[in-house]
Amino acid sequence: MAAPEDVAALQAEITRREEELASLKRRLAAALTAEPEPERPLRVPPPPLAPRAALSRDEILRYSRQLLLPELGVRGQLRLAAAAVLVVGCGGLGCPLAQYLAAAGVGRLGLVDHDVVETSNLARQVLHGEAQAGESKARSAAAALRRLNSAVECVAYPRALAEDWALDLVRGYDVVADCCDNVPTRYLVNDACVLAGRPLVSASALRFEGQMTVYHHDGGPCYRCVFPRPPPPETVTNCADGGVLGAVPGVLGCAQALEVLKIAAGLGSSYSGSMLLFDGLGGHFRRIRLRRRRPDCVVCGQQPTVTRLQDYEAFCGSSATDKCRALKLLCPEERISVTDYKRLLDSGAPHVLLDVRPQVEVDICRLPHSLHIPLSQLERRDADSLKLLGAALRKGKQESQEGVALPVYVICKLGNDSQKAVKVLQSLTAVPELDSLTVQDIVGGLMAWAAKIDGTFPQY
């Protein structure tokens, strides 16, 4: 049995340790709830991380499973601790990517995102929670990563990456991960990486599919080598329009994280000069070879003409955001606001409301008095759809006390497809009932209806 003085000493040591632990918990709680630090000047690259000579006891325990990998080992872990990675986009790709980089012990993470957390993000952007709705994505991600690994320095840049400061920022990091959601930013990040001499790990995801590759590394091509010219803006679909299953960007973000870790640890890259294609619905992974680096590439070629960053929105003809652009295809007389349509609806004036969204969106929500004919069927002049529209117009005319033709109001989600549908209806000759008929689209669509008229109507 231990002597009384030994028991007393142990009890005193336990008390001291408990007080120390309580103090550390109070400091941690204060740090997590403190106001964010002032943003560092964006034109000044962060100072390089100091090289590490050894791992601490806590680090050895924390990273013990990956330290056992002969390819990584202590040397690779020390390289990770001294590495700085810039993550452009803290959404469906950037969240899982940054999460695994922080967990693996990367020394510094720069997090660029101008957007704020929205409820519709939470199904796939796993660093953010319900309590963060309305907060900056960059700051929300940084706070979550600090909770995951307090040893990792997380620097938030809550603004859109732009040509006037992107190059200085990229020069302050060793590896860049492109997790953005728009074409202009992809070209901007690529050019900045080439001019700064940094490898770029890039991925994208939409619906059930995605792709991932490494640009400008180990003699491989850059983004411009593969895509010299941007696609026409009208051919680009984003997640807000096309949809995405959250696990798909999760898979691609994890693939990105693996490539970043290999490059940062000095293990090389598996996807420099090739691309991973993922089909989540079919469950297929496929690897394809990309074209080689182009000698005539305007940014990484033998005689480059792009020697500084440019206006990428002008170059691509689209904005550096994933927000849907509001089209202006019709004159004001061919459009009606949701407020005016609600007034018309309340008056009981006879009319036809034509919903031109795809069936999958109509299944989510609809106005009960609407007639559904998808825009795609109108565009291909589907005979059954035109008969359905003609029958609705004839029935409405017969039921109308005045016996006059009914006006048609066209609605969609945001007010873009409805304008296209009005153009189609104006050109139809196969439906006699449309001759000399008033056809207008409803500005802003059902999302404007939900925002301005009916707060209980679902938004998606």
Swiss-Prot record:
This is Adenylyltransferase and sulfurtransferase MOCS3. Keywords: ATP-binding, Cytoplasm, Disulfide bond, Metal-binding, Molybdenum cofactor biosynthesis, Multifunctional enzyme, Nucleotide-binding, Nucleotidyltransferase, Transferase, tRNA processing, Zinc. GO terms for molecular function: ATP binding; metal ion binding; molybdopterin-synthase adenylyltransferase activity; molybdopterin-synthase sulfurtransferase activity; nucleotidyltransferase activity; sulfurtransferase activity; URM1 activating enzyme activity. It is found in: Cytoplasm, Cytosol. The lineage of its organism: Eukaryota, Metazoa, Chordata, Craniata, Vertebrata. CDD domains: RHOD_ThiF (cd01526), ThiF_MoeB_HesA_family (cd00757). Its cofactor is Zn(2+). The modification Cysteine persulfide is found at residue 412. Binds 1 zinc ion per subunit. PROSITE patterns: RHODANESE_3. The gene is Mocs3. Gene3D superfamilies: NAD(P)-binding Rossmann-like Domain (3.40.50.720), Rhodanese-like domain (3.40.250.10).
